[in-house]
């Protein structure tokens, strides 16, 4: 809160801060990690910032402690993370300026699988299974966000990351939708890369990337 208030003061912006319980505090005060009162208040605010809510004190086997993804309640599908190097901060690579986008309402954490809860289940003590969901709608709209952001940047480049060669149906669907969206943005360069490959390139030379989805 000290940092947030200092940032607001620096801009001259007047902000009314409303602290709300969530996570461990929410459960201790209201009996659930995402209290209804908190959700209602969030719906009535202009914006909000969520601090760290994970805690090792949550009982492992108590399902009431599972945090219902608040991004699902508000359809916050795009996790946008800019990464940038600064001249006055020592770093291995100079001139790094990347925006990463990740779809966070689908995949392994979709909470919309045919299994209740997180989509994980254990048929016996030797096997655990996790399912994931990839949809055309979800793939298209995260790709669309990536291209919209790229269009506002100097390099105007989007790199789609997937593992289509192995996961032909799920990653394949994501890749297909990225290509369709790319055809609608003739002014933005588009390329694709294998997830294993980009892991190496980000270490060796991250400056070659602009917007990564």
Residue ranges and their predicted role:
Residues 11-15, 44-45, 75-77, 94-98, ...:
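Short coil/turn connectors at secondary-structure junctions
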